[in-house]
Amino acid sequence: MPSNSGDDNVLQVLIKNFDVLALPLVTLVYPLYASVKAIETRSLPEDEQWLTYWVLYALISLFELTFSKPLEWFPIWPYMKLFGICWLVLPQFNGAEHIYKHFIRPFYRDPQRATTKIWYVPHKKFNFFPKRDDDDILTAAEKYMEQHGTEAFERMIVKKDSYERGRSSRGINNHMIFDDDYRY
């Protein structure tokens, strides 16, 4: 069956303008429907979800109005907004509740404390791989000697050494294939 060039053109227009077509559906149509449904069912969690969504939608709209010129330089912005609003809207993710509880509500409850948290800069340099003292064998040995004394540490080493010698003399071989003295 030959393809109709008119159908191809319509499909191309739909694909090119996906964000323009999907954004109103995701940001307005579905939330309006779900909000009315939540009002009619008188479900408090659903009411909170959609009230929270509308607060966040208003903040996003204010952000867009304020920064419209710089946002024009980011062609990916409409797609980021679409995915972000999908995260806010879809009940599987419950994004609106998360954003509200962790960002909006603390600011509303205590603005002074919330702004302090936002502008807090740690004084220490962040280390991606912090050294844990528990994993360091030398630190563990030093702690053991501080708690039990050097004589107890030496006794422990001698005891372990004699235990290993006893195992090898009885024919119990505990070698691994990557040990230097392993015999094939």
Curated annotation (Swiss-Prot):
Keyword Nuclease tagged: no
Tissue specificity annotation: Predominantly expressed in flower buds and stem.
GO cellular component: a single term: plasmodesma
One family name in Pfam for this protein: TB2_DP1_HVA22
InterPro entries for the chain: TB2_DP1_HVA22
Transmembrane segments: 13-33, 51-71, 73-93
Membrane topology annotation: Multi-pass membrane protein
Gene Ontology biological-process entries: hyperosmotic salinity response; response to abscisic acid; response to water deprivation
Protein name: HVA22-like protein c
Organism the protein comes from: Arabidopsis thaliana
Gene name of the record: HVA22C
